[in-house]
């Protein structure tokens, strides 16, 4: 069994893909993008391109409107379709205030994973509903402790 990889020693196409994700989210979110962080296996050195997903947390300065949520979700669908790995991307977009001061379950503006791909692509998803996720608090702790910054301040600054 091969050893896992981290962002630093990931294959070139994976690193380039992270650059593309960062650029696309920056284009869609503009000045509202406060930070973008890798967590999970790719941050910890346990990433295997043939099976691991790419876990990301995007932090925004302000809440996203429903049309912006939809635009971001569709951008994530397109990015997923262009991924260089077998595992998909898993992205949660949360407001900075929640990244700094936990609320449980944690509110989020957008979540993308394989399970959400088709409902988003087929426009069968209601972006006007505010949602929460009980797992996001653990993901934020993971980002704070082992996260890799793609954009924004170091993840350790995500504390109140």
Each model region followed by its residue ranges:
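Helical scaffold of the NTase/Pol beta-like nucleotidyltransferase catalytic core
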Residues: 1-37, 68
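Conserved NTP/Mg2+-binding pocket subregion across the NTase superfamily
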Residues: 2-7, 74-160
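Phosphate-binding glycine-rich loops and adjacent basic patches that engage nucleotide phosphates
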Residues: 20, 29-41, 130-141
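Hydrophobic alpha-helical packing residues
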Residues: 21, 25, 72-79
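Short secondary-structure boundary/capping segments within folded domains
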Residues: 25-29, 44-49, 81-83
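Residue-level preference for alpha-helix termini and adjacent loops
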Residues: 32, 41, 46, 53, ...
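Catalytic metal-binding acidic patch
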Residues: 40, 44-74, 88-95
């Amino acid at each position: 069994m091969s050893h896992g990889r981290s962002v630093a020693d990931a294959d070139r196409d994976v690193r380039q893909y992270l650059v593309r994700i960062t650029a696309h989210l920056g284009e869609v979110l503009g000045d509202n993008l406060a930070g973008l962080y890798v967590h999970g296996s790719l941050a910890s050195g346990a990433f295997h391109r043939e099976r691991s997903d790419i876990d990301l947390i995007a932090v925004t300065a302000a809440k996203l409107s429903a049309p912006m949520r939809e635009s971001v979700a569709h951008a994530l669908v397109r990015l997923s379709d262009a991924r260089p790995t077998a595992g998909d991307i898993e992205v949660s977009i949360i407001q900075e205030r929640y990244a700094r001061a936990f609320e449980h379950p944690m509110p989020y503006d957008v979540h993308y994973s394989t399970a959400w791909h088709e409902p988003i692509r087929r426009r069968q998803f209601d972006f006007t509903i505010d949602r929460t996720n009980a797992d996001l608090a653990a993901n934020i702790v993971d980002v704070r402790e082992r996260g890799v910054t793609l954009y924004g301040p170091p993840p350790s600054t995500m504390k109140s």
